[in-house]
Amino acid sequence: MRDDNHFARRMRLFALAALFVLGAGGWSGVIAGTQVSFPCPPAIEPSVHFWVDVFAVYSARDFIVHDRDQVSRVYQVMHLPGSGYPGRDEAESIRAYLTQKYANILNHLATGAAPSTYEERRVAKLFQGESPSAYALAAQSLRVQQGMREQFREGLLRSRYYWPSMERTFRMFGLPPELVTLADVESGFYSRAKSGAGAVGIWQFTRTTGREHMRITRYHDDRLNPTTETEAAARLLRSNYDALGSWPLAITAYNYGTGGTEQASAEFGGDYSKIVRSYNGPHFGFASKNYYPEFLAAVEVHQNEDKYFPDMKYAETPTPPPVKTDFAPKRSARRSAHHHRHTHRARHAQRQVASAQTGHVKTGRATVMR
C-alpha cells in the first residue's frame, strides 16, 4: 500500500525544483502557421506556445499544472528527479497530488481570503483584476499535462522514413505537405499505435471511420498498412476541406468529426476562434479545441528541428516494424479446448506405442527398462 504521507512529503521536496522549472519554456519565435493556409488567430497563440513547450521543451518527467480552458495559465511545472519514463501509477499519483494541491489553493482564495503563502501569492498574480468567483471556476478546470519531449523526438526520427512517400500522396490529393505533420500529433508516426478508444495506426482511424475508406474485417485491417492508411487520411482531409472551406476547421474535423464541425461552423459563421471559445456541442472538449493548436506547434517544431533537437542530425533513422494486416482466425474457447484434449490424447497414444516398440515404459519422470 502506498504511504500517502510519505508521498506528500516527497512532493514537497520537489517544490523548489518545480518552481525553478516554471517559465522555462523555450519558444519565442514566429508561429509556423502564420502562412495563408494555416492561419494562427491571436486567440490561440498562447495555446500554440504551450504545445511547443510540451513537445520540445518539457520531458516526460515534467508535470505542467494548467487551466483546461486557458492553457497558458500555468500554475507550476514540477520536475520529477531521476531518469527515464515515470511508471503509470507514479504519474497518476503525481497528477492527483498536484490537482488536489491547487484545488485547495484556489478554493481557499475563492473565499475572499488574502493570499498568505508564497504559492498563494503566486497564484493570485495570475488572477489580477478578477473576482473571487474566478478562483472557484478555475478550481474546477485544473489539468496536469506531462511533457512529451522524448516521445516527440522519437516521432521526428520515425518521420524520416515515412515523410517522402506521405508527402507525395498528399500532393497527389492537392493537399499542403505540412499536413503530414498531423501524423506526429496522432501517433508519433508509429504504425502500430493503438488508442484506448480503438483508433489504430499512424493516422489513428477508428474502426467506424476507417471502414468508410479502407478494408477492415475480422481478419484484415488496412489501418496497419501505413501506405493505405495515409491514402485514407488524405481522402478524409481533402473531403473535410471541401466541406468546410478552411484548414483550421478541416483539421479540427479530423479529430472531432465532419458533421459536428459543420454544425459548429454553421452556428458561428465559420469563425474558428469563436468556435473554440464558445461552441458547446457534444464531446467538443479539450482534445478537439486544442487539436489545431497542437498541429501548428508540431509544424513549428518540425520546421525548426535543429533549434529544438540539435542532436538529431547525428541520430539514425529507425527501421519501422514490418507491415502485418492479416490475422489468423481465432478458435472459440470450447473448440480450442476440444482440439487441445484431442491432440494431447493422440500424442500420448503415440508415445505409448513408441515406448512399447523400443522396450521403454515411461512412469512419471523416470524411464524404466523392462
Please provide the spans of the model-predicted regions.
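Bacterial N-terminal signal peptides
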Residues: 15-25
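Bacterial N-terminal signal peptides that target proteins for export
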Residues: 3-15
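Extracytoplasmic and endomembrane cell-envelope/extracellular-matrix remodeling and assembly machinery
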Residues: 118-121, 125-155, 160-161, 173, ...
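An acidic, Gly/Ser/Thr/Pro-rich helix-cap/linker signature
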Residues: 29-171, 339, 348-349
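Alpha-helical scaffolds flanking conserved acidic
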Residues: 99, 176-183, 200, 247-252
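Short, surface-exposed glycine/acidic/tryptophan-bearing loops
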Residues: 137, 193-213
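A generic alpha-helix surface/boundary motif
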Residues: 163-164, 183, 204, 208, ...
